[in-house]
Amino acid sequence: MSGGSRIQLLSPRLANQIAAGEVVERPASVAKELLENSLDSGARRIEVEVEQGGVKLLRVRDNGGGIAPDDLPLALARHATSKIRELEDLEGVLSLGFRGEALASISSVARLTLTSRTADAGEAWQVETEGRDMTPRVQPAAHPVGTSVEVRDLFFNTPARRKFLKAEKTEFDHLQEVIRRLALARFDVGFHLRHNGKTIFSLHEATDEMARARRVGTICGPGFLEQALPIDVERNGLRLWGWVGLPTFSRSQADLQYFFVNGRAVRDKLVAHAVRQAYRDVLFNGRHPTFVLFLECDPTGVDVNVHPTKHEVRFREGRMVHDFLYGTLHRALADVRPEDQLAAPAAASEIVRPSGQQVGEFGPQGEMRLASPVLEQPQAEPRQSFTPGSGAGSGYQYQYTPRPSQPLPVAETQAVYREFYAPLDGTAPASLPESQGDIPPLGYALAQLKGIYILAENAVGLVLVDMHAAHERIMYERLKVAMASEGLSGQPLLVPESLALSQREADCAEEHAQWFQRLGFELQRLGPETVAIRQIPALLKQAEANRLVQDVLADLMEYGTSDRIQAHLNELLGTMACHGAVRANRRLAIPEMNALLRDMENTERSGQCNHGRPTWTQMGLDDLDKLFLRGR
């Protein structure tokens, strides 16, 4: 602090401009504050008109309750609000705005005109302010019941801030995204947007389930709904509903992720962590999941006053919320089966499908076996085995038996078909299923393509399966079940590893010692800032134990839980499954292919391999007709 400076009060104008730096970053920030005010007023129709990306003009007009004439000057004052009266009101606030800062901040960096009329008023009133002159001017005006706020020349009096604005298209894209989020949060409100005199969209009130789905399709694109799972789960005072995209409908950017807490759009680290865990082993590397999800909970259990723009929230029971989100999404993705995805006739946009029953089956060692072989198998080559190390806990050994790569003769293939479709007693003639309802979701195998793909026919059309990717997922899920049932064996260290931590980390390690024990670790506190690692999971003996424990402790302190150990274990199991899965260029008999299809139908997450790639795709009859220009 310099010796010549004296402490003095800031002028109201300067104080508001400083506050505007937190609230008003760009035209999209202004739109967010004005639209939230409109929603809080009970509006059922909101019109937004924009010029030059919102820099020259941003006008928001609603049919809400309006503002009384005597309250108009107060509406532009700092910390003037109708939402709360006492501190206790803040603990359970449901309104989107409550601080009373937005209009004052906006009016300090732009030319603002507010016109409003209440239902019991004979006429409307208007108040104007300009950045330099913070004194509001009130006068009569013509306006229906509701409120209009017009913001012109944003940052006209702060050139330094204006320099940081991007191109018109960029600013408008940000503004449009704000409106999209609010339109998803409030299906009961109509939103209408115009830019430079052109109508961008008109979203009418969505009062039923079909209308809500249409709005989601308009905002997120029709492809999202076709590749999304509707969910609605309620437990322990929490309700999660909405749509979660299938792993095959992922994005290169996290630009189709909408999460709302009690109607408020949020971007929260705890939520992001739970979603990331749920998609952990079904998403391709570098891809992002898609979702539109709504969490409803007791407002007193959520603190919304932790960020200037209210984008972040804090949950009183963060661990419970995290586990609820993760469990709900994880189960929803795991429960997907082909029959769920093929309930309706396929359209062109429904070609890519995830999958997830049993004529034959895969044996526990990963080799395919049939309930009753229909043709004599050639002499197998010596078995190759994959063994992930030796020692305690490494008893998982998975083998596969490669088959000769020569294709079956045509006559032998026909014999396979006759015997496969023949009744077990051999008395009735062979026949295909009599109705579409008898055909399994993934149908019956027709042929193998290039030793890589299985071509099958189901009630919809053709199915193509990547046999290695599909078998890899089946093996992986069985390995996880086996590990969960047999438990994790630990391997004691001859020389315990000493780990230097902060006191907070050491406290966390001591508090979660039993949790670590269940995962195969044994930690012992040696001092205020020292912990010894005495045992590690046998399957992770090649891992860097010190680094892993530190990363897990960081997660535990941040989120109250961690999936890092499980992620390491799953990575190892995934490698084992990959080595044990049937390889490309291995020729399969028709019954073997059908065995794989039935296992896919019974396996969780079988729509993606362990690396997130799709395992099968559907091509309906309509798609084939289009290829050959039939019906035109």
Curated annotation (Swiss-Prot):
Q: State the residue spans of region: Disordered.
A: 376-397
Please give the NCBIfam families that the UniProt record associates with this protein. Answer: mutl, PRK00095.1-2
What SUPFAM superfamilies is this protein classified in?
A: ATPase domain of HSP90 chaperone/DNA topoisomerase II/histidine kinase (SSF55874), DNA mismatch repair protein MutL (SSF118116), Ribosomal protein S5 domain 2-like (SSF54211)
Q: Which GO terms describe its molecular function?
A: ATP binding; ATP hydrolysis activity; ATP-dependent DNA damage sensor activity; mismatched DNA binding
Could you tell me what this protein is called? DNA mismatch repair protein MutL
What is this protein for, i.e. what is its function? Answer: This protein is involved in the repair of mismatches in DNA. It is required for dam-dependent methyl-directed DNA mismatch repair. May act as a 'molecular matchmaker', a protein that promotes the formation of a stable complex between two or more DNA-binding proteins in an ATP-dependent manner without itself being part of a final effector complex.
The text of the family note is:
Belongs to the DNA mismatch repair MutL/HexB family.
This protein's GO CC annotations: mismatch repair complex
Give the record's keywords alphabetically: DNA damage, DNA repair
Its source organism is Pseudomonas entomophila (strain L48)
- One family name in Pfam for this protein: HATPase_c_3
Q: Which gene encodes it?
A: mutL
One GO term of the biological process aspect: mismatch repair
